[in-house]
């Protein structure tokens, strides 16, 4: 699941994914966070 959160590294996505979907799992793809359920 892509969320509207710009990133430079995958670590930036973890708190964003935690807030968005309740799970701190994801990575940075094309400067956007992708979260995994």
UniProtKB/Swiss-Prot annotation:
The record marks 36 as: Aromatic residue of the functional dyad, important for the interaction with Kv1.2/KCNA2 channel. It is found in: Secreted. One of its GO terms (molecular function) is toxin activity. The record marks 27 as: Basic residue of the functional dyad, important for the interaction with Kv1.2/KCNA2 channel. Keywords: Calcium-activated potassium channel impairing toxin, Disulfide bond, Ion channel impairing toxin, Potassium channel impairing toxin, Secreted, Toxin, Voltage-gated potassium channel impairing toxin. Disulfide bonds join 13-33, 17-35. GO terms for biological process: envenomation resulting in occlusion of the pore of voltage-gated potassium channel in another organism. One of its GO terms (cellular component) is extracellular region. It holds the Pfam family Toxin_2. InterPro entries: Scorpion_toxin-like_sf, Scorpion_toxinS_K_inh. Expressed by the venom gland. Belongs to the short scorpion toxin superfamily. Potassium channel inhibitor family. Alpha-KTx 04 subfamily. Reversible blocker of voltage-gated potassium channel Kv1.2/KCNA2 (Kd=65 nM) and calcium-activated potassium channels KCa2.2/KCNN2 (Kd=575 nM) and KCa3.1/KCNN4 (Kd=59 nM). Negative results: does not inhibit the potassium channels Kv11.1/KCNH2, Kv1.3/KCNA3, Kv1.4/KCNA4, Kv1.5/KCNA5, Kv1.6/KCNA6, Kv11.1/KCNH2, KCa1.1/KCNN1, or the sodium channels Nav1.5/SCN7A and Nav1.4/SCN4A. This is Potassium channel toxin alpha-KTx 4.8. It comes from Centruroides margaritatus (Central American bark Scorpion).
């Amino acid at each position: 699941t892509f969320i509207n959160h710009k990133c430079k590294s995958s670590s930036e996505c973890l708190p964003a994914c935690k807030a968005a979907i309740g799970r701190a799992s994801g990575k940075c793809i094309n400067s956007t966070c992708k979260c995994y359920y």
